[in-house]
Amino acid sequence: MMRTGLVTVIFLALLLVGCVVYPGIGARFIAPQTVLQAFLHFDPQNFDHNVIVRLRLPRLAAALLTGASLGVAGALLQAVIRNPLGEPHILGLNAGAALAVVAASALGLAFPVGRPLLASTGGALLFLLILLLSSAGRSGLTPMKVTLCGVALSAFVSSITAAILILDEQTLLAMRTWLAGDLAGQDWATLGTSAWFSLGGFVLAIYLAPSLNMLALGDRMAQGLGVSVLRTRTFTLLAIALLCGAAVSIAGPIGFVGLLVPQIVRRLVSADLRVLLPLSACVGALLLLLADIIARTLFTPYELATGVMTALVGAPVFVIMATRMFK
């Protein structure tokens, strides 16, 4: 317990520091003390204060919300399919969410406030299809089959998304940076709607944590302990869909955060989901803040999409983990 408390305090302190440093980084550097003044004593006549509050604060909120949502979604996904390689981007949830948003935009049905609902529905439907296909055959649903079906269907759905973008130039121009996983150009309307979806996912995740802990012992053991396996998995899927939908609607399909974060927390603290889930939210938010800072400063004055940085780090980690699993 002491170790858990210490790790939690350290990560919260790092996150607090990140929240102060992050708004100061950009084309115009603003000192941390000015950032604090803007937060605590906002002056509408001060140019730096306006830059921080009106332009950079929404981006900070987007990074925190997206990182926390992806971190918790990854932890839930790994728990429900019992596979440490489980990740929303790899298993197709992000691809399904992106296809739903892009298709709606191409048909003229998209509106920013409704984007989280579209993304959640698309991600949930594709992941449900993955689970159904993975359940086929004598061996039933296994972690390996889920991963393979997820990778295959993710590639298939991504190709459909690419085809829509090639055929519809207007949608391509509107979605190009969003599809790369970008935190720029955020607005409070979309963030506010997405926050409700994230909150619903977080509440469900915390409620399901004890049942998911018992599910790790095996379906039969969990049933013997009074856990409804089907209900737990169904509500976990709903929580994952809400979290991924919120994250994708804000920043596009950012990958590998959900893979890295639960691994870090497990190694440092515990696999107990009652501890893992809240810490995954904290570490996910911190990780995405760091990734976005690097993306914005690595090739100044140019900016990379945040999703590019997470993929550059996450893809090699995924390959290493997969290699160790197959040994």
Segments the model singles out, each with a brief description of its role:
Residues 1-327:
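Alpha-helical transmembrane segments in inner-membrane proteins
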